């Protein structure tokens, strides 16, 4: 008889091992066997929980996305209620510690690449893109006409993605302070122009 709560403990252990495997070997080098080895369990257990490598990547990305959405919610709740503060909170969530570690950044890059070929991953990417745009647009719409708010949200989302991508590809720790400053300056520019 399985222990109560063991399923979630095991899944978390395997997701952590997947993040480490992608960090060390890339997505092509990440297999059910490499994940099992890092987690010190049998390949059969990995298959039992996730089915195959695609299922493992999907579960890992759902975990990373939950961390992002949790950081976004936490930071928005803690922010002052004005649009500038709440926009800055959304930006900060995208550069949260849960999103800028080497294993997570490499997993994001692998996910984006793979999402062009896998319908389930593509759907997850679309959900994430829509959620970011919706959060940004809702805040910009409090200070700008709706058409301008949509445009501003698209621009800020592109800036967030671009700053994050440049940071991820820089080969060292991401300079979150510099990224946040650029994004904050952009927000200030847009809100001042109204």
UniProtKB/Swiss-Prot annotation:
Regions recorded as binding DNA: 31-50
A GO term, aspect molecular function: DNA-binding transcription factor activity
PROSITE patterns registered for this protein in UniProt: HTH_TETR_1, HTH_TETR_2
HTH tetR-type domain segment(s): 8-68
Pathway where it operates: Amine and polyamine biosynthesis; betaine biosynthesis via choline pathway [regulation]
Annotated keywords: DNA-binding, Repressor, Transcription, Transcription regulation
UniProt-listed SUPFAM superfamilies: Homeodomain-like, Tetracyclin repressor-like, C-terminal domain
InterPro entries with a match to the protein in the record: BetI_C, DNA-bd_HTH_TetR-type_CS, Homeodomain-like_sf, HTH-type_TetR-like_transc_reg, HTH_TetR, Tet_transcr_reg_TetR-rel_C_sf, Tscrpt_rep_BetI
Signal peptide stretch: none
Gene3D superfamilies linked: Tetracycline Repressor, domain 2
An annotated GO BP: negative regulation of DNA-templated transcription
Job description of the protein: Repressor involved in the biosynthesis of the osmoprotectant glycine betaine. It represses transcription of the choline transporter BetT and the genes of BetAB involved in the synthesis of glycine betaine.
NCBIfam families (alphabetical): betaine_BetI (TIGR03384), PRK00767.1 (NF001978)
Protein name from the UniProt record: HTH-type transcriptional regulator BetI
Organism (species): Burkholderia cenocepacia (strain HI2424)
Lineage: Bacteria, Pseudomonadati, Pseudomonadota, Betaproteobacteria, Burkholderiales
């Amino acid at each position: 008889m399985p222990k109560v709560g063991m399923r979630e403990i095991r899944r978390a252990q395997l997701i952590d091992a997947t993040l480490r495997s992608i960090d060390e070997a890339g997505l092509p080098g990440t297999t059910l066997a490499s994940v099992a080895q890092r987690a010190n369990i049998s390949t059969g257990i990995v298959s039992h929980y996730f089915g195959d490598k695609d299922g493992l990547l999907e579960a890992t990305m759902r975990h990373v996305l939950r961390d992002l959405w949790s950081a976004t919610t936490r930071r928005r709740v803690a922010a002052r209620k004005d649009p500038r503060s709440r926009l800055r909170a959304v930006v900060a969530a995208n550069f949260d510690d849960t999103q800028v570690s080497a294993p997570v950044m490499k997993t994001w890059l692998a996910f984006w690449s793979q999402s062009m070929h896998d319908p389930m991953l593509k759907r997850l990417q679309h959900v994430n893109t829509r959620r970011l745009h919706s959060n940004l647009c809702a805040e910009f719409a409090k200070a700008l006409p709706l058409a301008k708010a949509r445009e501003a949200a698209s621009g800020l989302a592109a800036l967030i993605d671009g700053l994050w991508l440049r940071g991820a590809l820089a080969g060292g720790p991401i300079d979150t302070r510099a990224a946040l400053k650029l994004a904050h300056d952009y927000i200030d520019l847009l809100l001042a122009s109204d």
